[in-house]
């Protein structure tokens, strides 16, 4: 089995800044492997058996290799970085087009394609569905568990108020929620192995993409404004022994 996991390096969301065009300003902001991506990687590693492989891929600047290196430390078998100045400013559509191009260049279709359910910096949760649509693949959201079953996979989807068990054919796209997936800690030996592993870099030309189909030029949407939302809450304590005050408060609510 070949498992393909798309991951993302995200800035520390507590230190995020936004430029005048509404794009995230990543320079100087500490970055981490997106926690949702790690859930997807862990599920792929749990599925992997002898003879299987887990490939991780991310689109980003050169420093995104740190997230891929972390994936290799956790247990991934190989890693690819999709990096090109032309990719900058991509919306979810242009990002999905780039990731889809990688799948099409990957050779034989992966048995399963996995994403985190969303990214901590954008929270759109759109890319998995868009990639599935572009590939013509089945897509399953809120997956907490998966295991091989016959010619495909049995996946569990947790919607909060409802849990479903479905049959997913090979080549499906999964959006993975945390569920009961246990995080693993890499050994010292694995750290050393991962530090010596090659991270392959592919640019726009290697993926066969035109300059106007990627990044800001290939985006279908434009960010008008982006920023942090700050909320303040106040609390009013009403003495329950004073019916008049309680009545005044209730009238104020309506």
Give, region by region, the residue ranges found by the protein language model.
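Residues at the starts of beta-strands that form the adenosine-phosphate
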Residues: 2, 51-55, 78
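Short, glycine-rich nucleotide/cofactor-binding loops
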Residues: 8, 25-37, 239
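A glycine-rich helix N-cap at a beta->alpha junction
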Residues: 65-98, 102
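Short Gly/Thr/Asp-enriched flexible loops that form oxyanion-binding sites at enzyme active sites
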Residues: 122-137
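N-terminal nucleotide-binding beta1-loop-alpha1 segment
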Residues: 1-18
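Electrostatically charged, flexible surface regions
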Residues: 143-254
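Histidine-anchored nucleotide/phosphate-binding helix
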Residues: 37-48
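Glycine-rich phosphate-binding loop signature in dinucleotide/nucleotide-binding domains
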Residues: 103-110
